[in-house]
């Protein structure tokens, strides 16, 4: 890999010199550099960054620690400890229909403990429809189910939770009234 580490070459006659592991490493390197570029651009342009870190918490958080963007972790799937780290870095956490699932222990713990000024709601449409719509196509009208569950966990009214998360969204996206 060292001969070709700094280039992406499409010459087919080199094909016999590459092994599957080398190709995987090259593609992973290209992907990582692309993601770094996106994160860096968000920081340089002072734009909000929406991050989906599914099955890549360690790598993603390494990048976020390095670049320190204004970030929202979309469809958060991590532990309470990971949520706390994200909050310490000033990030927002977005939760959706998963909090209505019976087996969503991590999401319920996060929903119970996240500082309310760091919480956003989402649907992740067309996926992750909340109970009672599991297995169906999710849409934005279903966000209320996540809001009801989180409000119940936090012992606050749904309208209060919706106001808080609306204010948080305005803050994150830099929207003036």
Which residues make up each language-model segment?
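Mid-domain alpha/beta scaffold segments of enzyme catalytic cores
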Residues: 1-177
